[in-house]
């Protein structure tokens, strides 16, 4: 691709590597692997895949939501552990589920403005390791019981405006958009079936960085998404509502609580050509959207429309979509609102099957999109996701 870039294309920002860990289940294989270690392993592999040296990197921007207990600036920790010189900068971004999408937008902007030429962006999240918090201890708990707060739910999955779980927002969307339980379960089943088919066909192997995990029996190599489950419509139908007594959102038609890391390396196109780097795609542009927090799941439809307007495209120009499946209800709502062909959306399954490590999920869907575009020769792709609090983000990428 890079050898064909001429004129204005040389000012574009291109992707030169896209890697991720396999996604771990809650308290699963990655529970003892810290976000720092996960991110470092994947970053090193991404650098190797790109052909870049650590010294070529100008800055590092990583999304992370559950930062309590991780120490100062997880992005800086991963940068130095990966061998990137200490005279380069790094910072972390928290925009809840949109953390990576904001990170890659900032990385893109830094290159377009000429501040940097090579920027590492990505997301890291170990939801299994999120600590419990006590707000009673700072001032001294003289007597009585102390309340412990689950930081994973409090900081990652709880609507701060309505004081309820993200799952309630999905039930709100289902009710507002007239999406039945049967539709949601059918969508969830398809996600599981597509993900299992992709795994069996080895489609994720190239994008996944194996992680070695030491245990009592020795060293285990974790290299396959472990969250996908065998299920049927009948078994999904037996699940009770998870959030509202009369709701339709269940554990089976929602995304999981997961662990993982993903890294994407961006480069100025002219720099990539000078270094002889292979490129996966060019970043065409971004879109943001916002809505009422209680129906946050519809925001990808707003973000995608804004994205397409920004890049002067229409929906028919997009060959492939990766939409983060926070919940089946909101995913279906977005599909209906945009009138998308389901055959070009999440062709290898989505977060309901693969998992949703919140700060890393935007990167995971873009990594998967880029590799599917490469494999299937799709020219234009779009990745988007909703964000707790009533926001959405989107990115369009193009192969040339």
Predicted regions located by residue number:
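Condensing-enzyme catalytic core mediating Claisen C-C bond formation in acyl metabolism
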Residues: 2-35, 233-298, 302, 367-368, ...
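N-terminal extracellular/periplasmic Venus flytrap/periplasmic-binding protein-like
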Residues: 20-21, 32-41, 49, 183-274, ...
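Conserved beta-ketoacyl condensing-enzyme motif
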Residues: 31-98, 102-118, 123-142, 208-222, ...
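Short, well-ordered amphipathic alpha-helical segments that serve as non-catalytic structural scaffolds
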Residues: 36-51, 74-78, 103-106, 166-173, ...
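Conserved catalytic cysteine-centered active-site region
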Residues: 64-119, 161-165, 230-256, 337-364, ...
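Active-site-proximal alpha-helical scaffold in enzymes
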Residues: 95-125, 168, 174-203, 263-270, ...
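Flexible glycine-/small-residue-enriched beta->alpha junction loops
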Residues: 118-172
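Active-site pocket-lining segment
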Residues: 168-171, 204-207, 284-353
């Amino acid at each position: 691709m890079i050898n064909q870039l001429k004129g204005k294309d040389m000012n574009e920002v291109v992707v030169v590597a896209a890697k991720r860990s396999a996604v771990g289940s809650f308290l699963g294989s990655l529970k003892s692997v810290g976000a720092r270690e996960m991110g470092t392993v994947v970053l090193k592999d991404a650098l190797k895949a790109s052909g870049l040296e650590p010294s070529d990197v100008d800055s590092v921007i990583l999304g992370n939501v559950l930062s309590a207990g991780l120490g100062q600036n997880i992005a800086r920790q991963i940068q130095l552990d990966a061998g990137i010189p200490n005279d380069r900068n790094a910072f972390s971004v928290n925009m809840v589920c949109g953390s990576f999408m904001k990170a890659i937008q900032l990385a893109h902007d830094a290159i377009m403005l000429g501040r940097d030429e090579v920027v590492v962006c990505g997301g890291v999240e170990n939801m299994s390791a999120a600590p419990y918090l006590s707000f009673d201890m700072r001032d001294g708990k003289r007597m009585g019981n102390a309340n412990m707060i689950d930081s994973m739910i409090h900081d990652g999955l709880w609507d701060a405006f309505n004081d309820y779980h993200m799952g309630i927002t999905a039930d709100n969307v289902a009710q507002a958009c007239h999406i039945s339980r049967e539709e949601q379960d059918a969508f969830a089943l398809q996600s599981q079936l597509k993900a299992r088919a992709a795994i069996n066909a080895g489609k994720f192997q190239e994008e996944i960085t194996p992680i070695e995990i030491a245990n009592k029996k020795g060293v285990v190599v974790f290299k396959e998404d472990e969250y996908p489950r065998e299920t049927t419509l009948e078994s999904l139908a037996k699940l009770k509502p998870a959030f509202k007594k009369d709701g339709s959102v269940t554990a089976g038609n929602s995304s999981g609580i997961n662990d993982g890391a993903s890294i994407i390396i961006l480069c100025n196109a002219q720099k990539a050509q000078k270094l002889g780097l292979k490129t996966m795609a060019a970043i065409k542009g971004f879109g943001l959207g916002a809505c009422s927090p209680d129906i946050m799941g519809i925001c990808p439809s707003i973000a995608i429309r804004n994205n397409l307007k920004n890049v002067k495209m229409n929906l028919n120009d997009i060959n492939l979509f990766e939409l983060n499946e926070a919940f089946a209800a909101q995913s279906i709502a977005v599909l209906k609102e945009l009138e998308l062909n389901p055959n070009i959306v999440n062709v290898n399954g989505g977060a309901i099957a693969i998992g949703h490590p919140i700060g890393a999920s935007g990167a995971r869907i873009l990594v998967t999109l880029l590799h599917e575009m490469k494999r299937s020769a799709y020219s234009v792709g779009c990745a988007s996701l909703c964000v707790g609090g009533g926001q959405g983000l989107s990115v369009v990428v193009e192969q040339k």
